[in-house]
């Protein structure tokens, strides 16, 4: 379930990520998102690795901070992509107190044992301007709720119109079927006259 949520998240936030070159893993950092967990601010960072090594090979994904230390992160994959390649994910959650100690963040990947590491550009997480852009404002959430409500009302109206169309179609079919089942009107011929006129 978590992997599905992350794939949806990346599909919405990173719709134009470049792919790897000649089967070389290519790590990309998604824009960080600020969440409230138990009343505390946490920054979620996701690293998407395209053209990762298939299962069975030692393909690593990890994060490092500005001081060069590796950070504990959750990794998912590799998962098959529609184009036949493999994709891996790395997820890192940092509290607001840890941001300054670990930034800038870098995502690293290594295709196999002895392979060359590939890294992303450093990602700065703190800063007044950047944090405003990454935090989901309440007005945005309210706007999303309004859009969901409008979409639900529109779906309800379309469903009612569909039911009305089905009802009218069924009524018409019943009328036509009833006409076909009625016996044809009997044509009674007048009895032949036995009276002969004498001339």
UniProtKB/Swiss-Prot annotation:
Chief subcellular location: membrane
Extracellular compartment spans: 17-155
Entry membrane topology: Single-pass type I membrane protein
Region annotation Disordered: where it falls in the sequence: 117-139
Keyword Transmembrane helix: yes
GO cellular component: plasma membrane
Ranges that cross the membrane: 156-176
Region forming the signal peptide: 1-16
Tree of life domain: Eukaryota
Compartments reported by the entry: Membrane; Cell membrane
Name of one Pfam family that matches: PTCRA
GO biological processes: alpha-beta T cell differentiation; negative regulation of thymocyte apoptotic process; thymocyte apoptotic process
Disulfide bonds: 47-107
Ranges in the topological domain labelled Cytoplasmic: 177-199
Annotated glycan sites: 67, 117
InterPro entries: Ig-like_dom_sf, Ig-like_fold, PTCRA
Expressed in which tissues: Found in CD45+ but not in the CD45- fetal liver cells.
Protein's job: Component of the pre-T-cell receptor complex (composed of PTCRA, TCRB and the CD3 complex) that has a crucial role in early T-cell development, particularly alpha-beta T cell differentiation.
Oligomeric and partner information: Heterodimer with TCRB; disulfide linked. This heterodimer assembles with CD3 proteins into a signaling-competent pre-T-cell receptor complex. Interacts with RHBDD1.
Record-given protein name: Pre T-cell antigen receptor alpha
Organism field: Rattus norvegicus
